[in-house]
Amino acid sequence: MGFLDKLLGSTSEAQVKKLMPMVKRINELEGSMEALTDKELRAKTDEFRARLNNGETEDDLLPEAFAVVREAAKRTIGQRHYDVQLLGGIVLHQGRIAEMKTGEGKTITETLPAYLNALSGHGVHIVTVNDYLAERDAQWMGKIYKFLGMTVGCIIHEKDNDERREAYACDITYGTNNEFGFDYLRDNMVVYKSQMVQRELNYAIVDEVDSILIDEARTPLIISGHGEESTDMYEKADRFVCRLERGENIVKLSKSDQLMGVEQPESGDYMADIKARTVALTARGMEKAERFFGIDDISKQEYSELNHHIQQALKAHALFERDKDYVVQDGKVLIVDEFTGRLMLGRRYSDGLHQALEAKEGVKVERENRTLATITFQNYFRMFRKLAGMTGTAKTEEQEFQAIYDLDVVEIPTNKPLARKDLNDIVYTNQKAKFNAVVNEIVEVHKTGRPILVGTISVEKSEMLSHMLDMRGIKHEVLNAKLHAREAQIVAQAGKYGNVTIATNMAGRGTDILLGGNPDFLARQELLREGMEESMVEEATGHADTDDEEILAARGRYADAYARYKADTDAEHDQVVAVGGLHIIGTERHESRRIDNQLRGRAGRQGDPGSTRFYVSMEDDLMQRFGGERVRDLMQKISPDEDIPIEAGILTKQIEAAQKRVESYNFDIRKNVLQYDDVMNRQREIIYGQRRRVLMGEDIHDSIMEMVDETVSLRCAQFCPGSHPSSEWDMEGLRTEILNITAMDCGRDIAGITDAEKLQSAVKDFAHKAYRIKEDGLMQAAAQLGVDADMRELERVVLLRAVDEHWMDHIDAMDQLRQGISLQAIAQKDPVIAYRNAGFDMFDEMVQGIRERTVRNLYHVVISAGAPQRQQVAKPVETKGDAPARPKRIEGKISRNAPCPCGSGKKYKQCCGRDK
């Protein structure tokens, strides 16, 4: 806390103070709400909706609505909102971020603003980090909403379109950021309105908002379809890369060296910059590539595709580690989320990187995907009318939340004072000494009976530590991406006396670690083991009035089991508190202070005692990439003996300073990504907006005829320009081109015309006549075949398909443009401005292409007895970008719609790429 904060109080304290009168008003209403019957309490929902329709605002209703939700929670799930949870709810309703520490009840807090904002009927999205939490919270908190007469839906990966549509139509919809984002993209790919699943983006509450809006902001959501290219080249590139020798780490040149033109020293066959996540062949490596692939000069444009494959193979070997960045299961490469440690099932890296990893691991190489639609979380969530979020760790990123999302952060005070002790880091020179020390501390603390949670950054490290504990005879549980199925069970019991748990970053965000164990979880598990259906277990844990004998019997069984386990866990809770509570050991500092704080936050919930300690070595990724030399010099001054660990507050501060440098570096990258994506986002808004108007049934016949007029006018200007005498016109060329477009000969209609305006008018009249003839012919053919046909709907379908085909090509072209635009910086031009200008020129070209494709297809469409019926839109492959997304080298693939690199001004497919 800064000097002024100490003197004047923090901004958050001032905000909380301003909100306290509202909390007092809610508390004053508690007695009157308790006096209402269940029916009267439920009737409040209809009353509030009527009052909104009569001109009152959500702010007017807030005190009473929050009091109603608090009372409903007491009657359904047996929990009462604390005052700090009311504060959090008010902050969320205001469209801000509530920073609430672990164990302070974020899940129940969100019910207050969710109910209030759902009263308008426009829907509320509650966003979680995984399917398990979405389903759990929808069932658990859903009891409150349903009691008050509201509908609750849940979107998880397995649901089909009909189930998704039903869930989105509910008052409140739970789901993950990935599912919401992909559904948005899919909705903008459908051909019929009935295939859409989402409705308007009204109000979103994002749980673990830092994880979703910051950690995952650089990773674009991509829907892909399979490409047509062979996978052989990936395997060949991998065989080549395996023969290469890696050079020394790239040395950063001083500014004076850069100004003097000193070149980067090269060694080996390729260089890899771990910090910047880039790879490059050296001159020696290029020579080896030319010999291996039998080519003369690999830098030639014709070998750009080969260069691309080599680049991705180098990345796969130099930048991506098995059991850290990905795992191999059942012959497939599965991505590990670097922030949560969970497997990202069904997701693939884009741009051929996933295929390169498959070739590296010797599993079947799947075909490369083609991007059909893409968006970043930054731009998806900025589309909501109102956005709010919760997390235990947001203050460190407040600047970014304000700059990108216009969200401020309010720290909500804890319900009870924090009793956790955060101990100084212990620093070692190497990882072997560090992990030996970690195991020794686990053994010593375990003797006291204190539960221990050990955080690791990778599957590999968690398995290594597990093996070391086995050697010492310490019984323990392991929670990582390979063993995620028992996550809830392991985390729920991690606070029991004497338990030792090793976890990657997944560490059960959203599941509280209760000292002594979780009686509710234990009672539920007992009922499930006895054969009770999961839906009945949910009913058994509810409190709503019912006369259903089966539910009442289930509640009796749950109450008995809960009471038994509660007696045991309460006694064990006191036992664990007596020995010092949960002890957290971090085996490595993460790049982000927030991830470390999340691990720390597992201990000391609701005033319980606890302690945390991080072990660091100079060989850790963070220390090697950022600030290693500074800390190493400091260690030498404090203690020159490399075998003796150092524990000092000044070292901890230096490590946190290194983390701040990483956070600043990553923030700059995310800002850069956003600058580029904002260009694409504006184009996406235009295309998707117009597409949606067409989809919603807008009559586009007049627009189609305008497209016809524009298309034939361009042809007239091309073959018979008014600036030239008619003797120089190419009338035969115009006649042939109009025949190609309309499938009818306009020779008679334009014969003898020598005035440009009259010629253009005659061609337009002919095109309109040809269109009417085509429409009449289609309707007659449909009637003869007994097929339902509607020309207006046919126009919509043809236009939408033309939009989709050109938009997909445009995405590829824009990606290619972005990969090469960094060269503009060399020419002293702002690459973002150059990208924007070139991008909008390409956008104009695409729009013209859509018009021409639509017109041609409408004149040539035929109806047959085997015409396809309406189908559910297929679910294409969902992929992640090459995270973290960074500018790529120019040696990439050339999109067929990109400008040809030869400088002709034509598209690549119409020039050098004609025969490819």
Report the location of each language-model feature.
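Generic detector of ordered secondary-structure context
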Residues: 61, 302, 349, 393, ...
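Extended, charged helical/alpha-beta scaffold domains that provide interaction surfaces
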Residues: 326-334, 340-348, 577, 583-585, ...
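Conserved P-loop NTPase motor core
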Residues: 1-617, 622-638, 689, 706, ...
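Hydrophobic, well-ordered secondary-structure elements that form the walls
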Residues: 454, 502, 807, 843, ...
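A generic alpha-helix preference that emphasizes hydrophobic side chains
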Residues: 4, 66, 171, 354, ...
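A short, cysteine/histidine-rich metal-binding "knuckle" motif
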Residues: 892-898, 903-916
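Short, Lys/Glu-rich amphipathic helical modules
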Residues: 449-462, 696-697, 750-754, 901
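Active-site-adjacent structural elements in folded domains
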Residues: 110, 438, 885-887, 895
